[in-house]
């Protein structure tokens, strides 16, 4: 029956530890040597496919996570993707063919695919879904009816009451009775269908609102019951349902990790991070999924977001360097309206245009993916801090990172366990020499980092990260030769909205992968005449404009305009 009594719910919980372990052996950390996931929030499947080839594979990302692929409620808001109408692959991000092509393309690039999976509830309201399926609340023809829902039709109101959390409706969304055999079978069928197309793992949305034993039963029905799962179970002090209940089924997302990073970066000391992780009360490292932000928390404000500038970037650098959990790198789009859906309905023509932030491609972040892969299995060594906001540490004899979150530059000779030789600081593409004692000297500007690893032993024309943007249909390809010091970056701005309308804060960052040539392709309408200039920014936000008059150019009637410039001092 649809109703789960309180006694039954408690009985399920009492047996959850045994049931979860017995039915579905844990698969926590993603298998393989590459455990970083790029979370491409609301990117359509064609754009994800291209990104796997152009950036994610070459940068060393092990996984890409895509937003929910199933048919969903119509509407321009992002959250419509999280209101299923059916389990057909027919959402705003692409159809079954596009989904399969994306998986195959990503696999060819060496990137596995995780699908965000909404199995706790169905869509609210009534109408026609994105794939043409008619529905009304509690009635989803051919899939579920009212008897498949939990009997509590009220909105969750008491997180200290387990039955209320797991049997009532999350923000009025019809709550599936995951204790029913029919419901379990339908959910397993959906996940098996995705797996048949090549999906390698699943993020289980709203896992805390389903009993752990129910999820273990569903997982046991999968063709591969050991498939990678990552469960969203938000920690709340004093709540009836604890994220640790779900550790038997896979990675559990450790929300306290992101909240603690925000608190430290914004108001405490980086030196506190010396024992960050389990010693802070976080879940076991090998069963935890970690992140700096996700699509919910960046809007809710309980974690950092792209709007936090250097705090966000340095938190990401630390996360990827520190040996705790399996990291997610969130990559979304700019927003002022928290409900606003993706630009261009999820089509990404080029990074850093149309509001797409592409955090996964920021040099400071993407370069740390190879750092993490190289350092895998190595313990923290050579910890140093100044008792405040400058820290440094090694990962055995494989890697070393220094982070300066002070308000002024830091010059220091750092002691590492690296072999002597020439290295490339992957944060700035700057050569660094480690002497026979394992030492190097560097100056870090405020709010910057230096990162070395044994697989980056020279800076040259070979990109250490993929190109910043894929080709645009029409537009301008900016290529400017400019020298910088650690902490500085080159940007372009101009007299069009796509170029930031001359506002330094909205200028577009170029990629130094082929330093000293900085590159960026920007989509612009064919035939457009525009003015532009390059600027140099440091970590403190100081701006230096290149000298001389505004540069001028015109996009051709078809194709791209290629601009080869030199920064005018």
From Swiss-Prot:
Residues 468-569 form the CBM20 domain. Its EC number is 3.2.1.1. Coiled coil: none annotated. One of its GO terms (molecular function) is alpha-amylase activity. It comes from the Bacteria. Binds 1 Ca(2+) ion per subunit. Induction: By maltose, and repression by glucose. Residues 1-28 form the signal peptide. Ca(2+) binds at residues 120, 166, 175, 209. Its cofactor is Ca(2+). The active site is at 205 (nucleophile), 232 (proton donor). PROSITE patterns: CBM20. Keywords: Calcium, Carbohydrate metabolism, Glycosidase, Hydrolase, Metal-binding, Signal. The keyword Metal-binding applies. Monomer. This is Alpha-amylase. The lineage of its organism: Bacteria, Bacillati, Actinomycetota, Actinomycetes, Kitasatosporales.
